[in-house]
Swiss-Prot record:
UniProt-recorded name of the protein: Rop guanine nucleotide exchange factor 4
Lineage: Eukaryota, Viridiplantae, Streptophyta, Embryophyta, Tracheophyta
Organism, scientific name: Arabidopsis thaliana
Region described as Disordered: spans on this chain: 1-25, 55-87
Chief location of this protein within or outside the cell: cytoplasm
Acidic residues: compositionally biased ranges: 59-68
Length: 463
């Protein structure tokens, strides 16, 4: 009986030894960057379940041995099935990760002919596609499903693990005449990546907070919407929602009770909106800083006109040149921008003229951080009567105010060109991660605004 138990024990050991490395790796996906210590693995204590059962055999009668043997066999039988299921799941996950990294290395060219894009662009596209997969169908204030949340965390941890190897070498003194060098994460990754992870977790917490809501949604064109009933005490308030000028037809319709939301619910919505708005600003700042650190591609420079005046036009150029004190907000009011398309077109023109004037002043010799660029807004104007310096400073302030006034503005032609020709994998991770978080935060703010708008309209109608 003891020998059979020992044999059961020995049979269970190989199963655990095979599955353990995969389990250790994928319990925390960043474990891909850790080395697996084979010696310490085989020195682990073996499974003690069978030993405990066999240790009592001397104290029981022969009649009791058979039930014990059945129990041992049942325990090992169930354990083998569970281990087999775990191994199958881990093998499938491992195969998926192998395929994912193969696509990254091949540059999305599975033919292997070398026609794929560079690794940085592949990583950027992968993060963008992952965001579309996880959040593309999420059009309302509600928590993510467990499957999508696990997918997002697992895949993003995989992409973040790439940054563990992007380091810079710095000198370190030992207190003697001998100095050594050590490696640490590159400064931009060390500062921005933890901040982005924190913003990501905060956005997930905001979505998770919308579980027991006083509002609900109905799909446009559904029977409940057409009949004016949303499944609760009040209707969908369809007639008021349709009157919104900025209505997005692809979004579901938010509905509130006939008497409106309670004060506690409105307070909760406003608080979450403020949090999401701050997250949006932080992600936008990181994204702008990362884009400003990227070099301007030569292909973009060759498309620029010789003068900045040709880019912005006579009206804007006159305002930039003649005014003693330049007020960008007043210029935006004069232009009377009516759509996002017009705002994006203006941003492209101003950015092109800005690059042209900076080239003439020798300001494109190296990349600048966003903080350095903001200091130049006031610093360039103090360099005397250099016309190009003044025009560049005013164009930069105009572009900054334009992006502040239209936070939903799409990426400019220069930004797209930088991302397309970027070869720095670390910057690609930071830029794409901050961009998708910026988009998610903006969507959350918009969804909350939609609910508050319907609530405000319902209460005003009752008054």
């Amino acid at each position: 009986m003891e020998s059979s138990s020992n044999s059961d024990q020995n049979e269970g050991t190989p199963t655990s030894s095979v599955s353990s490395p995969y389990r250790r790796t994928y319990s925390d996906i960043s474990g891909l960057s850790h080395r697996f210590d084979v010696q310490s693995f085989y020195n682990r204590p073996s499974n003690t379940n069978a030993v405990v059962l066999s240790g009592h055999e001397e104290d029981v009668s022969e009649d009791a041995e058979e039930p014990k043997d059945d129990v041992v066999n049942d325990v090992h039988g169930d354990g083998d099935e569970e281990d087999s299921d775990i191994d199958s799941a881990e093998d499938a996950e491992l195969e998926m990760m192998r395929e994912r990294f193969a696509k990254l290395l091949l540059g999305e060219d599975m033919s292997g002919s070398g026609k794929g894009v560079c690794t940085a662009v592949t990583v950027s596209n992968s993060i963008t596609n992952l965001y579309a997969t996880v959040f593309g169908q999420s059009l309302r204030l509600q928590p993510l499903s467990t499957e999508k949340k696990d997918l997002w965390k697992r895949e993003m941890n995989c992409f973040m693990s790439i940054c563990d190897y992007i380091v810079e070498v710095i000198p370190r003194s030992l207190g003697t005449n001998v100095e050594i060098t050590e490696t640490k994460l590159r400064s931009d990754i060390l500062m921005s990546l933890p901040a982005l992870r924190k913003l990501d977790n905060m956005l997930m917490e905001i979505l998770d907070s919308f579980t027991e809501n006083e509002f609900w949604y109905v799909e446009r064109g559904s029977s409940s919407m057409n009949s004016g009933g949303g499944g609760r005490d009040s209707g969908t308030f369809r007639k008021v929602v349709v009157q919104r000028k900025d209505e997005k037809w692809w979004l579901p319709v938010p509905c509130v009770p006939a008497e409106g939301l309670s004060e506690e619910e409105r307070k909760h919505l406003r608080h979450k909106r403020d949090c999401a708005s701050q997250i949006h600003k932080a992600a936008l700042a990181i994204n702008d800083s990362t884009l400003n650190d990227m070099d301007i591609p030569d292909s973009y420079l060759t498309t620029l006109p010789k003068s900045g005046k040709a880019s912005v036009g006579d009206v804007i150029y006159k305002q930039l040149c003649t005014a003693e004190k330049f007020y960008p907000d007043q210029l935006l009011d004069i232009l009377k921008i009516t759509s996002e398309h017009e705002a994006l077109e203006l941003a492209d023109k101003v950015e092109a003229s800005l690059v042209t004037w900076r080239r003439k002043t020798g300001g494109l010799t190296h990349s600048k951080s966003s903080w350095d660029m903001m200091k130049d807004i006031s610093g360039d104007a103090d360099r005397g009567n250099d016309k190009n310096h003044i025009l560049a400073a005013r164009a930069r302030s105009l572009l900054f105010c334009l992006k502040q006034r239209y936070p939903e503005l799409s990426q400019t032609s220069l930004d797209i060109c930088k991302i397309q020709f970027n070869r720095d994998v670390g910057k690609a991770v930071l830029e794409s991660y901050s961009r998708v978080l910026e988009g998610l935060a903006y969507n959350v703010v918009s969804w909350i605004d939609d609910v508050l708008y319907v609530d405000r309209t319902v209460r005003n109608r009752d008054d």
